[in-house]
Amino acid sequence: IRDSSDEAIANGLPNLLISYHETQADAENNLFPITEEYDNIVAYQQTIYVRVEDTTITTDCFSYVELLLVVNDVPQINPDSSSLEVCDDDTDGFGLFDLSLSNEEVLNGLDPSEFTITYYENAENAENAENPIITPFAYTNITAFNQTVWVRVENNATECYNTSSIELTVNELPVLTQPDPLNLCDYNNPG
């Protein structure tokens, strides 16, 4: 809360002492400031109070403002790894995948119009929304035969997100041997 809220509340003014309190009375009396990370005690929406003092004034002059904390759920996507498989047509361990084929399974019943789905080659990039896979509809794996890619599902309204993984598998084609010619006897003479 503190860093982003402090800047917005101070609005560029210097020499301000800003403290956060659970109740209006605590803010007015400068009691029980919130000094650590704060876990809301009222689900989804809670008002806390921000006390602001000018450190250059020797008298106890202060103002306070209400700050509404809004907690949004993260998307409840499918936590189990999805998988996509293709055949290794040229026996090199690489194949072309349409990652979007996993969208429905990953969304786990969520409305696709409310979420943005992006894919990444590692978990860190998925968490930070950095370096997405540019062509998820035509992605060639970068690790032969088996590779994990990560999917990030972000709520368009709240920007809350969740991640999961997808296993890509390139299946080797069966090795065939040329059979010997099959000789049959034509007992009925049809040819």
Residues covered by each model-derived region:
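Extracellular low-complexity Ser/Thr/Asn/Gly-rich intrinsically disordered segments
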Residues: I1-G191
